[in-house]
Amino acid sequence: MAHIHDLAASLAPNYTANRLTTPTPTRFPRTPTFASMNKPCRFEGTVDDLEVTGTIPADLDGTFFRVQPDHRFPPLFEDDIHFNGDGAVTAVRIENGRAALRQRYVRTDRFEKEARAGRSLFGRYRNPWTDNESVKGVIRTASNTNVVFWRGVLLAMKEDGPPFAMDPVTLETLGRYDFEGQIVSPTFTAHPKVDPRTGEMVCFAYEAGGDGSDCSVDVAVWTVNGDGRKVEECWYKAPFAGMIHDCGISENWVVLALTPIKMNLERMKRGGNKFAWDPNEDQWYGVVPRRGAKSEDIIWFRADNAFHGHVAGCYELPSGEIVFDLTVADGNVFFFFPPDDNITPPDGIAKRNKLSSPTTRWIFDPKAKKSAIRTLDARDADVWVADERVKPTLTWLTNGEFSRIDERYNTKPYRHFWQAVVDPTKPYDFAACGPPAGGLFNCLGHYTWSGKNYHTGESTENGASGEGEGDGKFGLEDVYFSGPTMTFQEPTFIPREGGAEGEGYLIALLNHLDQLRNDVVIFDAQNLAKGPVAVIHLPLKLKLGLHGNWVDHRDIDAWQKRRSEDGDIGPVQVAKEPLPWQKKLAEQKGETGL
């Protein structure tokens, strides 16, 4: 009798020439994107009373939310990428020293269309020219990048489309969220920032001017106040159609990081990638006022080619200059978006065999002299660019990503930040684990700015200083190594009630690469090296997620009351009208009789 593995190997492939030709039976591609920790999970359900090692701190009462791209169906293209998976939200509810797990897919328009068809219908990542004709005009977002609690709802976000609202307790999808009809752009960031002092949410969108797939250079920035009312909106032009994944906010300014990974409409129409890395293009930083802005108020700063990671902190000095901290890698992090064939990298860049991702500090003067230029992508629009190029004022060799801070200190000088860290000097069991899916994030790091690098409200200096400068350190480092068979996903800081900055806990998902399962680990945020105080064991393998947040349950409970039928605000109002680009497309179809 043949062994089951022999039978499986003899099955006819579902893909011919990279294209899905046989939707059933369900079989996913045999590629690294769908292997190891990235094998599809597709779990929906609840698991109560999870096994725990150690002691969950008694003062933790809330939910750790995170989201993962998780293809519901085998993709249309065999070489599909991780970022194209359907958003699945995980909620780990913690109370009274116990933990429970709930997970559900975000019921986006895309998800619902494919669920009814019983197969994938949407093609390459952010490329509608590769979709099945039956879904033309459907919002393509998979809502798989971040989940943010806002005014009683959980917003599942991906920067290629509008957010979708979910119930924070049941994870039921309520519908597309347009801020009660106030924001109707085709795209919306996955990284809004909330000002803890004012309660305002500052948010933005790129490729915002058309249908979200036309490679426009339009950038919009909005502010929504704590009462849910849009109070600021301004539109700008970027120098080229590229990715603006994250931002920072200070008390008076917004900083947008434009990465030299470029869109090209003709490439997309040929069935190619949405993005291509351009090793000859600068990295750019756009600085705009938070209040009363006009389109010409933007100032773009240029620096040498590099790839932006995520923002740690952003604040202002007494001089009015802006401090902006984020990780910046020295090459293309998104290897699945290589340069176009006609692009020749500068000498040295093509020979890099590994990337470094330090934490860099930039200081921008919003009053710097600037000039209007014209670019090929912006066409006849003015792009306001600083006359002088910029360089980081310091580079801390953390080699990490997914920076997080105590968000009570958003817009303010901050002392502490945390990252998932790559340390290639630590042992790794390749025989047991294979290639580390998602990157070798084998450590968690806690970093504390010291000396002049921590700016108090009275600081007047902006130079780089502090112990350890000679070896690329600008403060204290507290690092925990996972072991030779494990890696971490993004950490999240949980503040201790009434505690000083950085006092609290750090929570993260731990990947057991040799066992293909996950744990949730909880640390004392200022003593990572001592190891976790509690480990919550999950009885299944999740996927590599992207971002998440902790929400205190007092906030959820209070908003549930306000959002009830007899509450002072009432139930969440989800979008009732199609987006403007959808209306326009419907009109065009009517005119042509399609």
From Swiss-Prot:
Fe cation binds at H191, H245, H310, H547. Trans-resveratrol binds at Y125, K158, E401. It catalyses: trans-resveratrol + O2 = 3,5-dihydroxybenzaldehyde + 4-hydroxybenzaldehyde; piceatannol + O2 = 3,5-dihydroxybenzaldehyde + 3,4-dihydroxybenzaldehyde. GO terms for molecular function: carotenoid dioxygenase activity; metal ion binding. It comes from the Eukaryota. InterPro entries: Carotenoid_Oase (IPR004294). Piceatannol binds at Y125, K158, E401. Keywords: Dioxygenase, Iron, Metal-binding, Oxidoreductase. GO terms for biological process: carotene catabolic process. Transmembrane segments: none annotated. Its EC number is 1.13.11.-. The keyword Iron applies. Binds 1 Fe(2+) ion per subunit. Its cofactor is Fe(2+). The keyword Metal-binding applies. Dioxygenase that cleaves the interphenyl C-alpha-C-beta double bond of resveratrol to yield 3,5-dihydroxybenzaldehyde and 4-hydroxybenzaldehyde. Also cleaves piceatannol, a compound that differs from resveratrol only in the occurrence of an additional hydroxyl group, which leads to the production of 3,4-dihydroxybenzaldehyde and 3,5-hydroxybenzaldehyde. This is Resveratrol cleavage oxygenase 1. It comes from Chaetomium globosum (strain ATCC 6205 / CBS 148.51 / DSM 1962 / NBRC 6347 / NRRL 1970) (Soil fungus). The gene is rco1.
